[in-house]
Regions:
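Surface-exposed peri-terminal alpha-helical interaction modules
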Residues: 1-121
Length: 121
């Protein structure tokens, strides 16, 4: 298992909106990796990192983030699930959009457009 202490230290230097923006970016990357059929071990590592980001942001006390973390951990425990790829792709994109919205950063409008496009594809 990797030592995430340095990564945590770096992640926690940013303010809460920026951390949520970084989390949203990682969730978007997960969605894209699943769609592109990136190596399963890489997807699992990314899910582990995302779960850590969510845990480290526990000080934000956002129940939604906790629920998302549980969902990501369930996916990670059972990955790869070939029949679940499209579902994880969509869920990660939805989570990314919601986390970006929670962050208050202006970029959430772009993520919203991307989500709407993917729902019609």
């Amino acid at each position: 298992m990797r030592d995430f202490s340095k990564r945590r230290e770096r992640y926690m230097r940013d303010n809460a909106p920026m951390r949520l923006g970084n989390l949203a970016s990682s969730l978007l990357r997960l969605s894209k990796w699943v769609k592109m059929k990136q190596r399963d071990d890489s997807v699992i590592d990314l899910m582990r990192e995302i779960a850590c980001f969510m845990e480290w942001d526990g000080d934000l006390s956002l129940v939604e983030i906790v629920d998302m973390q549980r969902e990501i951990c369930r996916w990670r425990r059972h990955w790869p699930i070939e029949s679940g790829r499209s579902e994880l792709e969509l869920r990660a994109l939805q989570m990314s959009n919601r986390v970006l919205e929670l962050s208050g950063l202006p970029e959430h409008r772009e993520a919203k457009k991307e989500l709407k496009k993917s729902e019609f594809v």
